[in-house]
Swiss-Prot record:
Functions in the biosynthesis of branched-chain amino acids. Catalyzes the dehydration of (2R,3R)-2,3-dihydroxy-3-methylpentanoate (2,3-dihydroxy-3-methylvalerate) into 2-oxo-3-methylpentanoate (2-oxo-3-methylvalerate) and of (2R)-2,3-dihydroxy-3-methylbutanoate (2,3-dihydroxyisovalerate) into 2-oxo-3-methylbutanoate (2-oxoisovalerate), the penultimate precursor to L-isoleucine and L-valine, respectively. GO terms for molecular function: 2 iron, 2 sulfur cluster binding; dihydroxy-acid dehydratase activity; magnesium ion binding. This is Dihydroxy-acid dehydratase. Its EC number is 4.2.1.9. It comes from Salmonella heidelberg (strain SL476). Transmembrane segments: none annotated.
Amino acid sequence: MPKYRSATTTHGRNMAGARALWRATGMTDSDFGKPIIAVVNSFTQFVPGHVHLRDLGKLVAEQIEASGGVAKEFNTIAVDDGIAMGHGGMLYSLPSRELIADSVEYMVNAHCADAMVCISNCDKITPGMLMASLRLNIPVIFVSGGPMEAGKTKLSDKIIKLDLVDAMIQGADPKVSDDQSNQVERSACPTCGSCSGMFTANSMNCLTEALGLSQPGNGSLLATHADRKQLFLNAGKRIVELTKRYYEQDDESALPRNIASKAAFENAMTLDIAMGGSTNTVLHLLAAAQEAEIDFTMSDIDKLSRKVPQLCKVAPSTQKYHMEDVHRAGGVLGILGELDRAGLLNRNVKNVLGLTLPQTLEQYDITVTQDEAVKKMFRAGPAGIRTTQAFSQDCRWDSLDDDRAAGCIRSLEYAYSKDGGLAVLYGNFAENGCIVKTAGVDDSILKFTGPAKVYESQDDAVEAILGGKVVEGDVVVIRYEGPKGGPGMQEMLYPTSFLKSMGLGKACALITDGRFSGGTSGLSIGHVSPEAASGGTIALIEDGDTIAIDIPNRSIQLQLSEAEIAARREAQEARGDKAWTPKNRQRQVSFALRAYASLATSADKGAVRDKSKLGG
């Protein structure tokens, strides 16, 4: 039977100094021998998804203490991708994931904590904490801050729903008046919480449910709603139970690697494809799987993408539905219920509540449950009041959306598309694959061929798009923006949004070894691997080269002969130490980012560190 990790610092005369310091934090004799549980918070006033988390750590801690544990809270950093977008700040976003994972490991191992409750929410914070949890493999429960309410405003005598992306598009559209742009900007992000669409933050919080590491409702219940408080209270109680099960009963089923098994990862990716989640989730699931020592690769994702239909469509792929609507339709478990009935899930998995998938669906799938409290929870809706306070309202929808023929969530028979919301493409300049969010691609451009317009930075591409140099039919190629080449693998939300604002959203393609915001839609293909800075063929594309994209057949091709590609590769190598670097880009890169780049792998590996360079 494993002994509590914390006993290392709380037992024995030689630990008198450590105990003295523990006492200075408020611990007493009666606390030594109890499990020490880290409450890993991520409160910050920089990020709307985290601005309301300050007191929620205390809420969890109080429940831990009441249940027989000792709670110790610490904070991680949190980058707001939307605020960091469109300038040099975006270079720091993806690297912050590694810093978060490392900081959690450092704090938990340095102080010998026995278990964790991770209070996350936004884009890199949930993945970073997930990576740390699977790396450490001690009992853990995730409880996130919850989604933002959708913005709403009246345009042309019609009430429309809004989000961050609408503000960006309207702000760059020369045809939109200053008054209308200002109106949209002021209405787009009305409350605390993670941005209201199926962007990266909400996608990842949904996936922690599918992995079994968070409670039902975690991915979709609004940040502002009073019902969300119960998730935090339950997490504090449940983590003590899980911790005692492992340390006192030698029950390894309480450990995250046994909950988030390969079968659970396959279920999470199946959910992701069915709900048209952010392409960033691919990057983060691949990274998390490596931390869990699970053999889960782009090949597995490709296989799933070929058989899983799209059963849910949410902003940015449509303005009709946002996360508040997904919740009304049954949330993550509403989608999983339909996938289960279609025979597309592994049923032999459990969650942090100790329930198998069939047991969870029986209790929480709104189409089958007899539990009125569950139905009431899924009727939790928006209040439409600007606020930065968690749990500040208790409004409810009059009814649930259980219409699986024409509602937000569909059954297999009435799927939005027989093809899922994400696809992996392969070709002669994406030998290791690339990702497209098919949920956001118009049917008219699922097959697309055009001449390349090549840019070696996001900034140059934006200038060209807004300057009218990109025209209908072009394939915009932005390279040297991968994990190593950026460095930091910037999101390309501004280029894709500006294509829309210039009327080219359905008339152009954009391809990059960088990545996209969860708010991106359109024919936007990212994560091209190998990246340009790692010798990828994307570095050899020239202006005017023809690129053919065929999403139904999962193909992307540079229409050049092998001989021509080989000749260009030879010319690139002849540049010596300048080979596989941008020719004319002026970018200041800090030593911190250079350190990140020196170990970064391409996107097909999750952009994690190259362990071979560290002797691992």
